[in-house]
Amino acid sequence: MSNIVLNTLRFKHPKLALLQSCSSFSDLKIIHGFLLRTHLISDVFVASRLLALCVDDSTFNKPTNLLGYAYGIFSQIQNPNLFVFNLLIRCFSTGAEPSKAFGFYTQMLKSRIWPDNITFPFLIKASSEMECVLVGEQTHSQIVRFGFQNDVYVENSLVHMYANCGFIAAAGRIFGQMGFRDVVSWTSMVAGYCKCGMVENAREMFDEMPHRNLFTWSIMINGYAKNNCFEKAIDLFEFMKREGVVANETVMVSVISSCAHLGALEFGERAYEYVVKSHMTVNLILGTALVDMFWRCGDIEKAIHVFEGLPETDSLSWSSIIKGLAVHGHAHKAMHYFSQMISLGFIPRDVTFTAVLSACSHGGLVEKGLEIYENMKKDHGIEPRLEHYGCIVDMLGRAGKLAEAENFILKMHVKPNAPILGALLGACKIYKNTEVAERVGNMLIKVKPEHSGYYVLLSNIYACAGQWDKIESLRDMMKEKLVKKPPGWSLIEIDGKINKFTMGDDQKHPEMGKIRRKWEEILGKIRLIGYKGNTGDAFFDVDEEEKESSIHMHSEKLAIAYGMMKTKPGTTIRIVKNLRVCEDCHTVTKLISEVYGRELIVRDRNRFHHFRNGVCSCRDYW
């Protein structure tokens, strides 16, 4: 339709001019009604412009039923053209039902309307969203049939689709055959390698790129974070800043999450300062990441401060602060935040209840915990999951209600997993209940036969009861199943640098000689106040002298010695480790906090331990 005819239509029907200023779904429906009454909907040009408003993401906030409404408009168009079909294919390719985009493509071909280079990128997008390479390959054959295989936009879509579906070799072949590669082509390959876990290949391609944009940096940093290369994610962010590239909220979420996993508080604080100084919009995702990072790095007070200052919150951000308070041992404060969350109208999710029940467990709030567990389904319609069952078992076990905990496990609607059984076995050790421990331990070894920690825990329970023949049987079972203990490691951040110490690999650190001498000094001081090595958690197939030597080389002891060496007196020492703290290390850390007057914060696999003046926040139950 010519501009003259369009202007004539606008002159005769002034409401058509409102199409460009439509600002809400209500406006759209009013204009739609006008077009129906005036029969202008029968004009394909006018109808297509109305349809375009439905699919344009920048026009107004879209209701959930928008796709259905768009299809209703489409059904009123008598002779839809290629522009209309492309709009619908685009709309559905990025929606909840991307497969429906192919229905419009089939209808388009039946109407003898042929696709163009706009059609295929959206069809490829749909197959990528479906993560169905078979549909993608069929679309690829259609691309070749209609001669668009050398179009750069189509090629970029194919590279992205194959990479997103995990077919990185196919993506690489198309990339290699491209006559022209733009930043999108390169970034799609980087993203594909990251998704397949091939971060070294991704970095190699990233470094080869002639030009990079912010999205490329974001993809590579996020790729490192998603593949547990947290230090590399932080290093690349530092390199990005040196290159003069300004980060956005997406980049900072990846960086801050990496700090959280490493327990890198110093760098996390610098990242937070960067967010503030850059005047970034602290949206829900970034805000929750900041809260999560601070409590995971051991600074629960800063986490509370950031949470209280968030411009907006949702159920996930509330769940994060509640979980943080729970693992730091602030049960009553966690319950206060949970009550506040409910009173403000936020709907708790399953992760919220995991956090709240964990708080009840750590705080010994048995009756309250059972009440919340019962109300979870009754008042909020949330079915219990393994995580919730685990919290209840842990809570009952901590309270010494071992029979109730075992009975709860037997009545569960699902098969118990290793963490649930492990929680009860740990309680059996604390309360020296060999009878329940044997039943639970045998179940546990069947569920997780390769986990060395459960054998050691059960053997310690037998040792306390003097049942040496059963210890011998466990030792034989471990040898038969080739069970090996995973290497323990501990991280400590000094001057913004992460230092990693690994059990049995103590010669890698360049200052290991000084560290060992510092540890001997610490050992001498804590022995003066009665310390004797507790070898209970050491493997039971070595002699006592070897056990004594091995426990003094545990990774957290080396990390603590290094921290004492490198920081001023009175400085808080923060350690992150991958395994549960053993009894000897727990005792040693309490004594160090008493002798040296320092606070030590240790994050292990289960929780945070705050050591002050010879006392731990876990109250010796972990």
UniProtKB/Swiss-Prot annotation:
Gene3D superfamilies (UniProt xref): Tetratricopeptide repeat domain
Region: Type E(+) motif, residue numbers: 496-527
GO MF annotations in UniProt: RNA binding; zinc ion binding
InterPro entries: DYW_dom (IPR032867), E_motif (IPR046848), Pentatricopeptide_rpt (IPR002885), PPR_At4g14850-like_plant (IPR046960), TPR-like_helical_dom_sf (IPR011990)
Pfam entry (one): DYW_deaminase
Stretch list, region Type DYW motif: 528-622
Segments annotated as PPR repeats: 81-115, 116-150, 151-181, 182-212, 213-247, 248-282, 283-313, 314-348, 349-384, 385-419
GO biological process: RNA modification
UniProt keyword terms in alphabetical order: Repeat
Type E motif: region residues: 420-495
Keyword Repeat belongs to the record: yes
Bilayer-crossing regions: none
Family of this protein: Belongs to the PPR family. PCMP-H subfamily.
Descriptive protein name: Pentatricopeptide repeat-containing protein At5g06540
